[in-house]
Amino acid sequence: TSYSGIGDRYVTVQLNAIAPRDDKGKPATSRALSEGDRALVIQSLLQACDANDGAADGMIFDVEHCGFDPMMLVCKGAKTDTCLSAEQARAISVGFAGPKDSRGEHVYTGFWYDTGIANTRGLPGLLVGAAPFLPEDRTSMDVDHEAALAATPIAMVGDTASWTSLSAFSSRGGKLLFVHGVSDQWFSAQDTTRYYRQLTADNGGAAAVMKWSRHFLVPGMGHCAGGEQALDHFDLLAALVNWVEKGVAPDSIIATGAAFPGRSRPLCPYPQHAQYKGVGDMQKAENFECR
């Protein structure tokens, strides 16, 4: 979690720099963006990217092709509820792009723009401010120093998080499934996806790796579960058992959730995403396909 912690703190530091101060003189991170500002970001995000998967349904399945840019929301004049100040838009844009060192290289990936970034229930989304377990009141960050601190314990135990040489595992019939909520506010789904792309590159390409490993992204879902606009109920274990014991690879996994009663969607193995077929009830997974 060392590097992911840098990513989380980096977002918080950007918000701290523009946040009003509390009665102790510390940044009131949760007030850097008002409730209206956060709602504006989510509404604009959905307008830009929701329908890319063929269904304007409050969920962004084609997240990699989402072209949302907070700078598009900068006020032309005075700040109102229908726009962001330049400082607010810049803080979001810089924070979500991820921390870079003095050489301009990413220390940790950025975060995708997704509906859960403004969550207020459970673990707060990244736009809300620092989570209770990551207290932070700094307004600047020495990324080089943070990266050096993170590298020390990893060097001592070995960087197992970057290992992609899994031929011994796969050759013995091992199967490996990854699942990650796109709105995870602790570990970036971009980072897991980066690892999976490297895994495929180092093990014969996507077609070869998909014979023993698949990666599923869950729009709107936060850290491990939850999300105010997510379908976070799915049986990954059953999919793994069917693959190992019956030889049935998971071409999709059906997801439901309390956020959208009566709705189901297929979770698709990366790089595919659920796409509406264009006909049929959009509440039903059967009317979507993995593309």
How would you label these PLM feature ranges?
Residues T1-R291:
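C-terminal His-loop and adjacent cap/lid subdomain of alpha/beta-hydrolase
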